[in-house]
């Protein structure tokens, strides 16, 4: 029964047309996940998109369209975005909390700034329900040259479960390369995408200080 419910969820998810498409800037010929992903006929239904116990899509129409989840628009609410050591964000740091990690945010307090600069820090998003996440957009701090240069991604479907690292084609934890300046938007597509409720970004490298503005992309299909 649970698998039937999950299959029905995916059928609904892929049954609508994307209202906003963001083209990939990646070279598909060089992306190892592109070589592994299979191209499904959209008419085959949800069963071809779901395998029991999977936490990523094994067969998908390659997410030709990507819908912003809502960091920039505000659809993602403040309580959905948290970070490591939240009790330490007092005084000046109270203006740079996890909720400020929103793409294209401007002005004072325009990003999440980690109070500590080490690889044990994280930024977490609770999607409130299981969604298909197909990409990540990042920027640095808007007013000063501070940004994240590389990061890893973890996910889980339930807060009672252990975190799972997103892997590369060799089975190692994938390292995503981030920003090289404070204003450019860097897009990393997830091939295959992640089916999950909770997502974590773990900074692995940074310029001066860990600073993030971001957006998640939700997978959408052009198939009606």
Curated annotation (Swiss-Prot):
Bilayer disposition of the protein: Peripheral membrane protein
Q: Name one GO molecular function term.
A: protein-containing complex binding
Keywords from the UniProt entry:
Cell adhesion, Cell membrane, Disulfide bond, Lipid-binding, Membrane, Secreted, Sensory transduction, Signal, Vision
Location of the F5/8 type C domain: 63-219
Using the UniProt record, give the first listed, main subcellular location: secreted
Q: Which Pfam families match?
A: F5_F8_type_C
Q: Does this entry carry the keyword Cell membrane?
A: yes
Question: What start and end residues bound the annotated signal peptide?
Answer: 1-23
Database matches in InterPro entries: FA58C, Galactose-bd-like_sf, Neuropilin_MCO_CoagFactor
Location of the protein in the cell: Secreted; Cell membrane
GO biological process entries:
cell adhesion; protein homooligomerization; retina layer formation; visual perception
Question: Which consequence is recorded for altering residue 89 to C?
Answer: Decreases phosphatidylserine binding
Q: Which PROSITE patterns match?
A: FA58C_1, FA58C_3
Q: What happens when the gene is disrupted?
A: No visible phenotype at birth. After two months, mutant males display a profound disorganization of the inner and outer nuclear layer of the retina, with increased extracellular spaces in the region of photoreceptor ribbon synapses and the appearance of gaps, and a decrease in the number of photoreceptor cell outer segments. The number of cone photoreceptors is reduced threefold. After three months, mutant males display a layer of small, cyst-like structures in the inner retina.
Query: Tissue expression, per UniProt?
Result: Detected in the eye cup. Detected in retina, in the inner segment of the photoreceptors, the inner nuclear layer, the inner plexiform layer and the ganglion cell layer (at protein level). Restricted to the retina. At the mRNA level, detected only within the photoreceptor cell layer, most prominently within the inner segments of the photoreceptors. Undetectable in the inner plexiform layers and the inner nuclear layer.
Q: Which Gene3D superfamilies match?
A: Galactose-binding domain-like (2.60.120.260)
Q: List the disulfide bonds.
A: 63-219, 110-142
- Description of how the protein assembles with itself and partners: Homooctamer of 4 homodimers; disulfide-linked. The homooctamer has a flat, cogwheel structure with a diameter of about 14 nm. Two stacked octamers can assemble to form a hexadecamer.
Q: What does this protein do?
A: Binds negatively charged membrane lipids, such as phosphatidylserine and phosphoinositides. May play a role in cell-cell adhesion processes in the retina, via homomeric interaction between octamers present on the surface of two neighboring cells. Required for normal structure and function of the retina.
Its protein name is: Retinoschisin
Native source species = Mus musculus
The record lists the lineage as:
Eukaryota, Metazoa, Chordata, Craniata, Vertebrata
**Gene behind this protein:** Rs1
């Amino acid at each position: 029964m649970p698998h039937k419910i999950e299959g029905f969820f995916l059928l609904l998810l892929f049954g609508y047309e994307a209202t906003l498409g963001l083209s990939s800037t990646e070279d598909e010929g060089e992306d190892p996940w592109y070589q592994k992903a299979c191209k499904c006929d959209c008419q085959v239904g949800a069963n071809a998109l779901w395998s029991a116990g999977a936490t990523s899509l094994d067969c998908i129409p390659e997410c030709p369209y990507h819908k912003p989840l809502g960091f920039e628009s505000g659809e993602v609410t403040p309580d959905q975005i948290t970070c490591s050591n939240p009790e330490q964000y007092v005084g000046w740091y109270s203006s740079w909390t996890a909720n400020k990690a929103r793409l294209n945010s401007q002005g004072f307090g325009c990003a999440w700034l980690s109070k500590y600069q080490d690889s044990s820090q994280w930024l977490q998003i609770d999607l409130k329900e299981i969604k298909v996440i197909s990409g990540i957009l990042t920027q640095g701090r808007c007013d000063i040259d501070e940004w994240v240069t590389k990061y890893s991604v973890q996910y889980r479907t339930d807060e009672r479960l252990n975190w799972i690292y997103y892997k590369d084609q060799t089975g190692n934890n994938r390292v995503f390369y981030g920003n090289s300046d404070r204003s450019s938007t860097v897009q990393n597509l997830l091939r295959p995408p992640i089916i999950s409720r909770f997502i974590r970004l773990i900074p692995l490298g940074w310029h001066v200080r860990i600073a993030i503005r971001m957006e998640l992309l939700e997978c959408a299909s052009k198939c009606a």
